[in-house]
Amino acid sequence: MKTNTHSCQQPSQQQPCASAQQPSCSQPGQQPCASGHQLCVIGLGYVGLPLARLFSTKYKTIGFDRNHNRVAEIMSGHDSTMELDERLLKEAIEKNGFLCTSELEKIKECNIYIVAVPTPVDENNRPDLTPLIGASRTVGQVISPGDIVIYESTVYPGVTEEECIPIIEAESGLTYNKDFYAGYSPERINPGDKEHTVEKIKKVTSGSTPQVAEIVDNLYNSVLINGTHKAPSIRVAEASKIIENSQRDVNIAFMNELAKIFNAMGIDTRDVLEAASSKWNFIKMSPGLVGGHCISVDPYYLIQKAQVYGVLPRIMTSARRLNDGMGAYVAEQTIKCMNKKGVLVKDSRILILGITFKENCPDTRNTKVLDIYHTLSEYTRNITIYDPWANPDSVAREYGLTITPALPELAAAREGAVCELPAAGAAEAAASEVAAGCAAAGAGAGSSGELPAACPAAAAGKYDAIILAVAHNQFKDLNYKALLAPNGIIYDVKGFLPREIVDARL
């Protein structure tokens, strides 16, 4: 029972309070209050933290996360996901009174709980609702009559009311749509996207009753620049999110299939797409690896639910299978390029640029770059993964791989050496060129004329193959000439580099 009581009246048919004074309804059968919100956002990752910060600009907001280290990091003003501008985070803490905690006692006074936890799949690609179940139990331990719980996690239609609500009822002893209420507003965060930030994203909203739907819609509208779309039901809102990502997965699978066809025919796929996109209604997308915690995961939620209803979703299933095989395909195409140039694949030295699931983002969840690595590791163990965005400790912990956050050779790359490479097929890396690279790096030759041991270009001409797997901005300015061995090849997954310096691209 909350101590800061709402000004709402007791009859079960009453309207939501219109007063902004001290809101907290606390009687069984209580109607939801429409004002004076005190919010708790449960789950402070890529989605939850930016959302909590945004709400703190208008409402008293507390962030809750079971990870004590994450809470401490945030309260120190740091966000390791790099999703939230730390200036905004510090402002929220210092000026808005934004608080993060792992203590249940500190969130009991809230009257709106927003759940933003991951919804992954297991090793068999079946929906894993463990984080969602845990968060629902947390809500059940603190929720009071009149409160509202809003879910943002991506799920198949029915999860909120069929899986989550019964847990809250069991934990709290309260009755759904009599004592407490629910809403669903699916997250639309695009990790690493600094243009479409949370306040600029139009949100779908919904509620368990028309009255609650209005409260939830007004809540989000109060902080969003581009407003909301109020769905007619929670199930409709759930379905809308799951098809957003499933549609994108299917479209990318089509592009990947085209890439395989055109590569076999010796036609550049991106040239084809550029030409086709000259028609006004052609939907231009690009082939590539599909990883991360959304597009490569969410379709499995709908696939499983469809099968429960006796429907076999053939297109989505085929798209998932095709996209999941693209890492191995890239590795095989790289090997093919090496063979064509007479480069021995066995024990060759290969550099993979990027391990995160997308560009300019530290998120490595479900990255398909691993499939490139594992396929190539059947032929050579001399594989280096370089990613200036990824956390080496996180990668080691999650995947058992050692990556490097820096390459010694890169110190030789300076402005003016962007993508400097001999024409495709050239097979020499003269010592004078290496020395020039050292001079550009500010390291002169010793009195003997030999390169000093500390010269960053001393290891130039190192890799037999370079695979640009992730289009981080930093990779645009690398000195590829200094990195590539004589007759080495470059494979560009993203079509990111100048065509004249690459041997093949997806």
Regions found by a protein language model. Name each.
Residues A441-A443:
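Proteins enriched for Cys/Gly/acidic motifs involved in redox and nucleic-acid/cofactor modification
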